[in-house]
């Protein structure tokens, strides 16, 4: 099939209002918009101004009204509790309406903020949709976040109510949430009126009299709430970016542009249709969970999977394949980190052969840069297209992708292909000139961005402009560095901060990681720039070997140094690599390169609130000391 990508992309830039007006016809509107794009106050653009709709209605009630109420809407699969539960659209709508009614009974109204601090349980999805139903603005905070980080979000969002749970459950441990919540509520200057607690049998919590309510008691007897008509430009949610310092940045998502963009993405980018099954193996605390566990699949009339488990360890590296086979997943979206973990434990893909994956047709990777070796390994063993794509919390959906629904373009490993409709992506120099093909620059998006992207930060227009708009006037700064090739394919090499200067040569650590990950013994890797008296900076590699590798570290490191020298050149100055057991990551799978760099350079650092296991930093420190770095660390 000839790809319709070029036609769609060209029209979206030439006639954005006509293009998006056509796309928006797929969404149910209580009242049509007055203007597709209100550009009267740049850089603050508003999509579908004057339009009225309800996101929850479009995600649930619309499908019931069209005769699909008995279709599976949500499948909860929890290997950590040995639970599988399925909700039809009828059942999910009824649960959502009842919780929405309980919120209304508590006095929660349109525009009020509600923080959701919960694990991966159906009640978390129900809570998000219940807020959307009545126009309350939800702010989901990753379950288990430290008290001080949760307190910052409470003070910024100023919620009237918090929906939470007694505990979260990991592979081998129960994480009590209630003490963290209590600590945050005590720390916060803003005083929360009510906390509603879902009691999980694995770790019940004591309730604070006069403030806390049991979830079941809260919902009991509540009259179901109908959907509230909302302006397209009204906020749907606020999601705070992870790993921030000081006051966190609250990314705002509107109702209208969000619904239009996400429903479009399900068909155009992911090639999904109503009645099919989509699985985003992420967490609702991250943007992937918001967009592709909750909103986009349901807006598109798909079945969505809510997975409370891990890629390995619940119980083995075949966990993903069991879920795909058991629930008939057609397309999956996860982070490359998950596949590196699977590849490390099951390098020959033996577990894949034990499950019927005949209905599975596409794998999508995003969340961090995908090295070609991981992509090719997944493609070789799964025998389906493996599509790397690129986007951010701020955009809420893909900036660049190989759009399956428009007809795939040829895959180039290492590239997320080309910009998606509506995104006018440029590669810019420091002085705002476009870079020639093949040369690395700062990746920026010409304003206005398409529907679904952040209109601003929560109560922080000045921070919005400073963070994203000042560096390249007229453009949104992605913070990523990369280049375009001769065919117009984008390559995202690293964060702008990860470009290192070795004796005056600007080099991408991402390019070096690509070379290291291609070594047959390497499961995953990271490269950071460390201070050097002579060259200013030099690259330092960290590598984790695959399961079963028994060769000496010295031999492997020598080969890695030779690979960099051959494929990038002596100019890279790559002379040191450390073999470690594991790399420090956030809970969403992003490698903490900046923290490793600060440890190596003996600088002060604070472990990010999003870190998965702080103990790994001690292991990294010991490895660095053994190589002569981190000299001033205790």
Regions found by a protein language model. Give the residues of each.
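Conserved AMP-binding/adenylation subdomain of ANL enzymes
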Residues: 259-277, 287-331, 344-350
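Conserved pre-ATP/AMP-binding loop-to-beta segment of ANL
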Residues: 70-72, 195-198, 208-240, 247, ...
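Conserved ATP/PPi-binding loop(s) of AMP-dependent carboxylate-activating enzymes
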Residues: 418-422, 433-468, 507, 604-605
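Conserved AMP-binding/adenylate-forming core of the ANL superfamily
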Residues: 56-57, 74-129, 146-151, 207-217, ...
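AMP-binding/adenylate-forming catalytic core of the ANL superfamily
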Residues: 141-166, 181, 325, 332, ...
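Structural core segment of the AMP-binding/adenylate-forming
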Residues: 129, 133-217, 328, 336
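Gly/Ser/Thr-rich phosphate-binding loop
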Residues: 302, 330-334, 343-410, 424, ...
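AMP-binding/adenylate-forming catalytic domain of the ANL superfamily
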Residues: 193-199, 566-591, 603-633
